Amino acid sequence: MIDIQKIRADFPILAQEINEKPLAYLDNAATSQKPKQVIEALTHYYEFDNANVHRGVHTLAARATDAYESARGKVAKFIHAREVAEIIFTRGTTSAINLVVDSYAEANIEAGDEIVISYLEHHSNLIPWQQLAKRKGAVLKYIELEEDGTISVEQAKKTIGEKTKIVALAHVSNVLGTITPMKEIAAIAHQFGAVILVDGAQAVPHMEVDVVDLDADFYAFSGHKMMAPTGIGALYGKRELLDAMEPTEFGGEMIDFVELYDSTWKELPWKFEAGTPIIGGAIALGAAIDYLAEVGLANIHAHEQALASYAIEEMSKIEGITIYGPKDASKRCGLVTFNLEGAHPHDIATILDEDGIAIRAGHHCAQPLMKWLGVSSTARASFYIYNTKEEIDALIDGLKLTKEYFGL
């Protein structure tokens, strides 16, 4: 069980009021709030250990390096990687996916090869593959969705085949919250000799992820969605794949030896981390992982699903509300995307903000999915470890007020 009030006390931002109303932050799929433990880890680094890593023998450099590499170890343990060297620090999910595209895919995709994604994908896991396919003359194929917006193993089997070289899918949809059967789809991909990349931006913060059990070849995620600062994320890759890949950025830190006309690279993971890394961000990510591990991801997932189930139940009672995705909360993570007939999503979000309720409105960086849903935009409420049933009640009251405001 989660002690919500104890957890909420760890998040300074939640104590404030917006428009003289208590802040109800329901925009966690966009970014998460930060507990004081993470903020303190970041400030401690800058107050006491600020130095560059791997490049000095003085005490500050040694402490900074130890903290930075310790964070890498925490990431590896958190997602159950085989070894620490398989964890590459990146700026976030987007840069992690682009690293795979620009290095692995650029070297291995040829004209006529097929890349399989889905209509669920965030633009960050669509545009890089789209542009690669255009450059290479490859074929981009989409797994059809079921009526409730889920990806089924059956549809994956129909799409993945002999010409498939890469499968790239979101573990959890940032719009519908649907959970992809990634382990089964990875097995299908591997039957045809394809590699699978998983966009885990919406999964790692909210549920247990075991990259070895999934048999993912690559797994990308961001820190800011799991209570760490912006600008830090990670890419997991199987060692044999990463070893064979060439760096895509060059400069200090990633080199082994430099001559006038040639250079050699460091071993994993550092050959992919050119320049001064995001040291403070990585250390803070480690602190966020400590926090999540202490609460327990199983507890977090159950809490969020309970909130989603309650939100769906209460929203369904409001005439004119359309909820997208499966109504069964066990098939999704803790977010609900919806529309109110007669009210634009941006108007809904604006009215809710007057009551201190923060949600997201727009296409959520998923325009192909919006087209599949038959809409241009939606409203989205997304939950996390610190959200409460009372905040869902406030959301429901705000939606009823929106109906009154527009005379619906």
Residue ranges of each PLM-predicted region?
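Pyridoxal 5′-phosphate
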Residues: M1-L408
